[in-house]
Structure formats: structure tokens, C-alpha cells
A protein has these predicted regions:
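Short, charged, surface-exposed secondary-structure boundary motifs
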Residues: 95-96, 119-124, 258-260
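Active-site neighborhood of glycoside hydrolase catalytic domains
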Residues: 1-118
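Generic recognition of flexible, low-complexity loop/linker segments
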Residues: 96-100, 132-135, 211-215, 226, ...
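Aromatic/acidic polysaccharide-binding cleft in carbohydrate-active enzymes
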Residues: 108-188, 204-207
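Conserved, mostly hydrophobic/aromatic
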Residues: 13, 85, 137, 145, ...
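Carbohydrate-binding surface patches
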Residues: 194, 205-242, 249, 253
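Active-site proximal loops enriched in glycine and acidic residues that flank catalytic Cys/His/Asp
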Residues: 60, 89, 111-116, 146-150, ...
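Stable alpha-helical elements in mature extracytoplasmic
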Residues: 39, 43, 96, 130-133, ...
């Protein structure tokens, strides 16, 4: 409510960031049973009593423990307050999002954190994040993709004690002067966020190991296709939409966003 009074709407919260990582600061380990109990006995009723519509999203940790989200969602009392589950990809496979979706199709899926370590290998980091997150997460039912973090100084600050000491911001802001540098995650997100506007929906496109891709239909009727050449050589490919076909070529490791 205090944030709302300042003009900032909190769309969603998770009970705890990375509940199976006790090494962040502040942090503590939280089991799936404890999270479910907290949601159904405290957080959910408190939101309900205050008339808050802010979403409660469970898990908020890696893809190697999809069972955690499923255990929270299987708790009837907790599930009544839970909008969906959130994932990171520091371990596991992005297909875990589909595993949870298939078990609980009425609940939403979100991708809520991945950082680029500094100093970045631009080409390698761009390809990995686009492959797994910008393309992989929506293909596995995620409604969003968040990169962490928005901005840092040249020494990767500020961060909490015990927090990430080499997380490269999308922007590096100089500690003196006005210099702002755009980094890898700026371009990772820009390939989608500039074109796939809120209200867009994913539409079907043919999967390929060489030309990774994901397609969207925007609210104003435009089609957006994000493609990555995941091979080691220049790759020709075709885009067919209804009766129209266009032939294109993409260099090794290149990413492109196409709009029509």
C-alpha cells in the first residue's frame, strides 16, 4: 500500500527468493511444506483481509527442483491463494516449466531471474540467454522473462553482504560523471521487450535445433519472430506465414527479431 501511494503497483510477490539457498544475505532455507503453511495461514489471508489483489507466486528458484512448486500447488489451502510458480535456471533444464504446467495447467508460470556474470562474454552469453530464456521460457509456458539486474556500477555494486559480487547490470552507471554503458542483458531483453508488448500471446512456430525461434501475436495484430542461429556456421532459413514465404540468412550465433 505504501508503494501504491507512491505510484508503484506491486503486481506480484514470492514468499522468499531462492528458498533452497541459505547463503544469500538476507536469506534462510524454507521447505515446500513451510512455504505452503506460510501462504495458507499467514500471507494469503493477510492479503485477502487487506483487500489486496497482488499475486502470490510460489517457489522462485531453480529448474532442478520442479517438485517443490508441485508440492506447494498440491496443498489445497495454499493453492487457493497461489497464482503460479516462478523459476530460475542456475540448475536444471528449462523444460521443468512445462513439467509444472502439465501437472497444474490452471496455474501460471513465470521466469523471474537470471544474471549475466561480469565481465561478460557477449556472444556466448547472448546466445545462451536467448536460447534458454527469451525463446526457451515462453516455449515452456512462461508468461514473462526477467533478467537480473537492471543496473550496477563498474564494480558490480551495490549488493548486500553475501550477495552476488559479479552480477553485471543491463546498464553500467559510472560512479562519477554521466557515462552509461549498455551490457549484454540489455540486448538480450531488447530483442523481445521492444517488440513483444504487454498483451502479446505466443503463437506456434516450427521448432528447430539450428534456428531456435519463438513467435508472438501482439495486441495490434503484428507478428513477431525471434530467431537465434544456434549453429557454428551461417544458416539459411525460410519463414512461411499463410501463403507467403521469405528466405533469410543468419550468421553463426546471431539473433534477430522480425516483425510483420
Amino acid at each position: 500500500k505504501a508503494m501504491k501511494a507512491l505510484g508503484i503497483t506491486i503486481d506480484a510477490v514470492t514468499p522468499q527468493n531462492e528458498p533452497q539457498n541459505p547463503y544469500n544475505n538476507p536469506s534462510m532455507q524454507l521447505s515446500s511444506g513451510q512455504e505452503a503453511d506460510f501462504i495458507k495461514s499467514a500471507l494469503g489471508p493477510a492479503f485477502q483481509g487487506a483487500g489486496l489483489t497482488t499475486k502470490i507466486i510460489c517457489w522462485d528458484h531453480n529448474c532442478d527442483q520442479a517438485s517443490y512448486a508441485q508440492e506447494v500447488l498440491s496443498d489445497v489451502g495454499a493453492s487457493a491463494f497461489v497464482d503460479g510458480s516462478a523459476f530460475h535456471l542456475y540448475a536444471g533444464d528449462i523444460s521443468a516449466l512445462s513439467t509444472v504446467h502439465n501437472a497444474y495447467p490452471a496455474k501460471n508460470i513465470y521466469f523471474t531471474e537470471q544474471y549475466v556474470a561480469g565481465p561478460s562474454n557477449f556472444g556466448g552469453d547472448l546466445a545462451w540467454h536467448v536460447r534458454n530464456l527469451i525463446i526457451g521460457a515462453p516455449r515452456n509456458w512462461s508468461r514473462n522473462v526477467l533478467e537480473w539486474n537492471l543496473a550496477s556500477d563498474p564494480n558490480y555494486n551495490p549488493h548486500t553482504p553475501g550477495g552476488c559480487s559479479n552480477c553485471l547490470g543491463a546498464l553500467t552507471i559510472a560512479t562519477s560523471g554521466t557515462l552509461v554503458s549498455r551490457n549484454t542483458s540489455y540486448y538480450i531483453i531488447a530483442h523481445a521487450s521492444k517488440f513483444v508488448r504487454p498483451g502479446s500471446v505466443r503463437i506456434e512456430s516450427t521448432a528447430s535445433d539450428k534456428i531456435r525461434n519463438v513467435a508472438f501475436l501482439t495486441p495490434d495484430g503484428k507478428k513477431v519472430l525471434i530467431v537465434l542461429n544456434d549453429g557454428g556456421a551461417t544458416q539459411p532459413f525460410n519463414i512461411q506465414y499463410q501463403s507467403r514465404v521469405i528466405s533469410l540468412t543468419l550468421g553463426a550465433g546471431d539473433v534477430a527479431t522480425l516483425v510483420w
